[in-house]
Amino acid sequence: MLTQPEYRASRCTRFRYRYSGCSRCADACPHEAIELSDEGVKISAEACQNCSLCAAACPTEALLADKLPRIEVLKRAVKRPEVTFACAPSELQGNEIVPCLGALDAAMLAYLASRGIAVTLAGAQHCADCIHGASGETRLSLNLEAVEVLRGNVGHEKWAEISVPDEGDSRSGTSDHDPSRRHLFRRFVGRGADQLTRPVPASEAQPVPLKAIRFAAPFSTAGRELLQILFNTPQELPTPLSAHAGLLAAQVAIRPGCTACEACARACPTGAMQVRESATAWQLGFEFTRCVGCGVCVEVCQPHVLYFRDTMEALAKSPEAAALHALGKQRCTRCERFFISPAPAEICPTCEGDDADFASLFG
């Protein structure tokens, strides 16, 4: 009997922010089993084939696939000097049988490689004939390319290779193949892999009321914690790490024009966007180690000043969040309460609102 991934609404950016345009899970699903709404997502039990591709595509891990329990798989894999993952539809043999090779995310693969564990991916040559192949092959390509991006920046000589056997080697599950030389690393065109995680452009975003944001406790994801293990390297990186759609992490930056509305911090599901304030000061901070690159902060930003940088720097864990924007608090001349304003003002927004209400009632 087929089961379907568990949906955890409080982690979903579409649930957290009603107007989110995130469609990563639906884009990754080759069976059109996912329905999107401003309440989140709904999975069709009839259409779902439990390939786990939707779960792998979700940066907040709102979808949990029981057919691919990542942490349990890693716990078994790290006990071996080498491990072969075989996709279930190919019926090939392997140490771990997974529903689709594309569901093995870059963080998992890079983590194993960083520990010197050689990884073989058996069954990729069957993608063209597989029921999951419509997006499974694209996702696999995306993840393998992301691993090579990591290898080029945080990797070292002890990193093991990730092999994709040719047809003749698939039964043995061994190969000296370098995946960077195959078609799996082609550049995508049209609605390509790099578009799967691209945030909505600011020009298409619409101002939204704060009631569209549902608050929930922040959380961390297993995939982001695996990435941070790789990022916490003692040596200085030779070059900044290029942002990549297969790496569920991002560095947020800000342009001039922040209104201190705090919508980004309210919508952020992981607590990467933070508001810190004292009696006299207000600050918007960003904690890179918590960011999964979901992009909801960019979507919800009403003045459209937040954006993702093209590169990521200072990857190691920092003792405190980086300051994106800071303001001094002002005191209202009428009610004497402290308030925040992007420009000097005599009275606070509450008193301004009272004045507007009074004027509308009495002219």
Locations of regions flagged by a protein language model:
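A short, hydrophobic/aromatic-rich structural module that often spans a beta strand
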Residues: K42-D66, D178, L324, D354-G363
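Alpha-helix capping and helix-coil boundary motifs
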Residues: D27, K67-P69, E277
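Short, structured interface segments
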Residues: L53-I71, V300-A314
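ABC transporter nucleotide-binding domain
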Residues: E46, K67-E82
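Non-ligating segments of multi-cofactor redox enzymes
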Residues: M1-S23, A77-A281, F288-R290, V296-E299, ...
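Minor-groove-contacting beta-hairpin "wing" of winged helix-turn-helix DNA-binding domains
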Residues: V41-I43, A281-G285
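Conserved hydrophobic residue
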Residues: I34-E35, L63, M273, L306
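Extreme N-terminal leader/targeting regions
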Residues: M1-A62
